[in-house]
């Protein structure tokens, strides 16, 4: 059990900007607004930031662009981009850098204006030579293949996929910042426009704008800052393929590897987890990740989510902000998993606040079920 860095760093500031529609703002401006909010929330100054971790879908050299825009001359940077899971990976990398003394205050940040820039839900994250002949729509076609295989192999139904979207919407209806609110039934999901069989438009994540950021420092410093520290407990990443045609099994993701390693580092069991934040780009994601992370046996995910089990008041709190399906999804969603987990652990989530939230599992996904990164955050009570 490798717990050498467990509890050594903490998130002390979070910020978001332009959630939903942010007309007139560029990706770097939304990133900058969120970053300044996170730094202020931490009780720090911009000049205190000496480590920058960024991944964007609009900059080839994200840390160069971010640091120039914000006017930071950092001691350490990392621009690792493994898709939407990058920010969970950045939690681990920032912790390592802080513990090694390479920086003293680390900013993790992201921004996108995908919605108001007219972006569609498409991705170039696949090596196109594998699939171009078949004219797929990336990334939806790849996820629909996984959903179809799961339905064929385990008897998962479209109604069970719809349960995921309905549960997410129920959480979103408790979140005033969520972009999509209002009633949504299983029948509504089933009747919505078919995009890539078996996934309808309501099975697919939103296309929104949004910027997000968080600030980490070493644990000893965190105790002297204004907010209750939210401690890094552990993280691990795994990747088995890039193109979905190279995925070993369409029903098993590398979360089955990253999850146990992260859980081992964090020193927690499933029973300890109060909040599960999953990258729900599509309804099948939630089902696959609940299985692969060990909350239910393989093939049981569809039945597991039935009857409001992951909705407000259910047995397992999943995606309490409304997720990528109903809250926010500006191209890369992983940053917003962190923001919601911190909000819940700080007990600042308003109407959707969980009664107990000391340990949160965050799981990021990149590419087409390609990059999987699991992380754990916790309150002081979790140490």
What are these regions (language model features)?
Residues 1-25, 163, 194-257, 261, ...:
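Condensing-enzyme catalytic core mediating Claisen C-C bond formation in acyl metabolism
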Residues 3-7, 55-131, 135-142, 180-206, ...:
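Conserved catalytic cysteine-centered active-site region
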Residues 59-69, 244-248, 280-303, 314, ...:
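Short glycine/threonine-rich loop-to-helix capping motif typified by GTGT followed
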């Amino acid at each position: 059990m490798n717990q050498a860095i467990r509890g050594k760093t903490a998130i002390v500031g979070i910020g978001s900007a332009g959630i939903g529609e942010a007309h007139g703002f560029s990706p770097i401006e939304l990133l900058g607004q969120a970053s300044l909010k996170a730094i202020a929330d931490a009780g720090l100054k911009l000049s205190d930031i000496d480590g920058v971790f960024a991944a964007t879908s609009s900059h080839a050299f994200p840390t160069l662009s971010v640091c120039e825009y914000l006017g930071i001359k950092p001691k350490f940077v990392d621009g690792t981009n493994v898709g939407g899971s990058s920010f969970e990976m950045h939690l681990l990398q920032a912790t390592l850098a802080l513990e090694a003394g390479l920086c003293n205050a680390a900013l993790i940040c992201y921004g996108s204006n995908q919605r108001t820039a007219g972006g569609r839900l498409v991705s170039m994250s696949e090596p196109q030579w594998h699939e171009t002949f078949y004219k797929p729509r990336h990334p939806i076609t790849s996820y629909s293949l996984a959903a179809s295989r799961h339905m064929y192999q385990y008897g998962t139904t479209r109604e069970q996929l719809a349960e995921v979207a309905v549960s997410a919407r129920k959480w979103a209806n408790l979140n005033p910042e969520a972009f999509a609110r209002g009633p949504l039934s299983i029948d509504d999901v089933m009747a919505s426009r078919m995009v890539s069989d078996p996934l309808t438009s309501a099975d697919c994540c939103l296309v929104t704008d949004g910027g997000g950021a968080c600030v980490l420092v070493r644990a000893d410093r965190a105790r002297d800052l204004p907010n209750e520290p939210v401690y890094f407990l552990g993280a691990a990443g795994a990747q088995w393929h890039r193109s979905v045609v190279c995925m070993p099994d369409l029903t098993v993701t590398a979360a089955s590897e990253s999850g146990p390693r992260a859980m081992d580092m964090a020193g927690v069991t499933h029973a300890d987890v109060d909040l599960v934040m999953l990258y729900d780009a599509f309804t099948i994601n939630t089902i696959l990740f609940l299985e692969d992370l060990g909350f239910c046996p393989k093939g049981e995910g569809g039945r597991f989510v039935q009857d409001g089990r992951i909705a407000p008041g259910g047995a397992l709190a999943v995606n309490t902000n409304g997720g990528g399906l109903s809250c926010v999804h500006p191209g890369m969603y992983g940053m917003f998993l962190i923001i919601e987990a911190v909000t819940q652990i700080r007990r600042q989530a308003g109407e959707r606040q969980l009664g107990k939230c000391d340990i949160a599992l965050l799981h990021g996904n990149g590419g087409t079920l390609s990059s999987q990164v699991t992380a754990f955050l916790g309150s002081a009570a979790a140490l």
